[in-house]
């Protein structure tokens, strides 16, 4: 994004609309700090500039990665899906991605107003990668990895920024305590925030094994969830859904 200095009247109406505070007054002009801007297009789509001075620019790699992770209308070329992640567990009764005894994790790194660099995204991915997890192959962050066994990202995008990015992986129930431990440790080494979602299949007696495990290892959690109600076709005959 850029602001056309010849059209801009310095009315400052656009400044509050940037979630990353990237629109700033500098040398008696209103400019976009390109280091802070995540190319989300919010300033443009807000349509608050009276002279249409806010302009969208053509993005080249690796800067283009900012837009697909931050703009609500951009889509990933590989998956043709907009957004930062996949359907996760929400379509499990159709996809069968998550099986009995497995736990899916969704690490939502960064937030609008805070943002994240892909360096911090990689730090978290590398930390959980050491445990031996299976990164979701259709996840946009996974598609940026050069080594999916470790979680290492491409070197040329590590200093790029985004509102947020979601790391998705699954592992066995037995490795959940180790995942919790490494996430607590890596949280001290990054310069952003992240939230953790986790999911498992429901047992035949209606219990949720993951919640019982969290209680045993004293992990604070909110049990509000997204439940498959069985309206989709059953992909895994004999598996709990």
Where are these regions (language model features)?
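Iron-sulfur cluster-binding cysteine motifs and their immediate structural context
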Residues: 2-3, 9, 13-34, 38-62
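Long, contiguous binding/interaction regions
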Residues: 9, 66-101, 125-129, 159, ...
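Structural motif
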Residues: 29, 134-136, 194-195
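Flanking helices and flexible, charged tails adjoining ferredoxin-like Fe-S electron-transfer domains
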Residues: 42-139, 145-152
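Short beta-strand-to-loop capping motifs
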Residues: 109-111, 169-173
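Short, conserved charged micro-motifs
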Residues: 115-120, 173-182
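Flexible loop/N-cap segments at domain edges
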Residues: 161-167
């Amino acid at each position: 994004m850029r602001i056309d200095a010849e059209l801009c009247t310095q009315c400052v109406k656009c400044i509050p609309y940037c979630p990353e505070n990237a629109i700033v007054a500098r040398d008696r002009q209103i400019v976009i700090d390109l280091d802070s801007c995540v190319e989300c297009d919010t300033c443009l789509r807000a349509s608050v500039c009276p002279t249409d001075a806010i302009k969208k620019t053509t993005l080249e790699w690796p800067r283009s990665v900012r837009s697909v992770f931050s703009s609500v209308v951009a889509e990933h070329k590989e998956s043709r899906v907009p957004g930062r992640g996949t359907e996760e567990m929400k379509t499990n009764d159709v996809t069968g991605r998550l099986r009995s005894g497995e736990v899916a994790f969704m690490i939502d790194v960064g937030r609008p107003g805070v943002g994240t660099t892909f360096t911090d995204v990689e730090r978290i991915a590398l930390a959980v990668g050491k445990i031996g997890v299976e990164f979701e192959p259709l996840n946009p962050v996974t598609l940026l990895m050069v080594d999916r066994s470790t979680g290492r990202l491409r070197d040329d995008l590590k200093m790029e920024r985004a509102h947020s990015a979601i790391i998705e992986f699954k592992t066995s129930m037995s490795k959940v305590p180790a995942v919790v431990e490494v996430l607590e440790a890596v949280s001290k080494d990054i310069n952003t925030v992240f939230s953790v979602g986790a999911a498992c299949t429901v047992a035949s007696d209606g219990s949720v094994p993951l919640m019982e495990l969290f209680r045993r290892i004293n992990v604070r959690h909110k049990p509000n969830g997204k439940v498959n109600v069985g309206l989709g076709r059953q992909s895994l005959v004999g598996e709990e859904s």
